[in-house]
Amino acid sequence: MWGYLIGAAAAGVSAVGYQSMAPTGQWFGRAFTGLRRPSKLLALTYDDGPNDPHTLRLLEVLARHDVHATFFLIGRYVKRRPDIAREVVKAGHVVGNHTFNHPLLIFQRAPQVRTELRACQSALADAVGEHCNLFRPPFGGRRPAVFRIARQMGLEPIMWNVTGYDWNAPSAEHIERKVARQLRGGDVILLHDGGHRAFGADRSHTGTASDRLISRYKSEGFQFSTITEMMGAGASHPPTAVGGKAD
């Protein structure tokens, strides 16, 4: 009996731990992870910028393909390079809140979570002059209070369901292979244009992989959209974007 109870408790703890980090988990609050119905839309998202020079180089790749993406920016980097954040919005992309310091929020108290989100919101407002209403938790880590606080601040939680596992700067071939292995229409792709540990992380391979992935999937009839556009395709009341291509 005791063995059964201990095993059940351990399984419960394991499940809770998994759900706190799993990008598609919904136990701790609803988050957008892609379209549930068949679609030819794909959404590229980039975390941990702005980053010099790789965010700017990535903007060149996206412009060459006439593709718009969503960038979840770290507030302290926005403070350091507001000009790059402005270039992202100027190019027609959407920006979102990725906290100010990139902490793992499951270990932060509610006041700390609010401080992180507000500081990033302030940095984005100072840089681009508009209110941002998309939020992605660092590492995907969250608990119920995280999404509750975000929504109280008018932020919509955004996760992903496909990743290129590019945070350790693998080869472009590795990134492309990881994405292609998982990708289906309606998916949200997580990549990185910066690194949370330090400004200036090498993301050249992510830019190369993005170039190849866009070419490949455009040739197969897919279209790339911002998160806001994708949410609009699946709901009657999508969130208002900061940046994005004008109608």
Question: Where do the language-model regions lie?
Answer:
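Hydrophobic alpha-helical topogenic segments used for membrane insertion/localization
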Residues: 1-20
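Active-site beta->alpha N-cap acidic-glycine motif
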Residues: 20-106, 112, 116, 123, ...
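C-terminal domain-boundary segment and adjacent tail
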Residues: 21-38, 64-66, 79, 201-247
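Charged helix-capping and loop-helix junction motifs
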Residues: 86, 112-117, 172-177, 203-210
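A short acidic, helix-capping loop that chelates divalent metal ions and anchors anionic groups
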Residues: 103-108, 196-200
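His/Asp/Glu-enriched short active-site or ligand-binding loop at hydrolase and phosphoryl-transfer sites
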Residues: 141, 147-182, 222-233
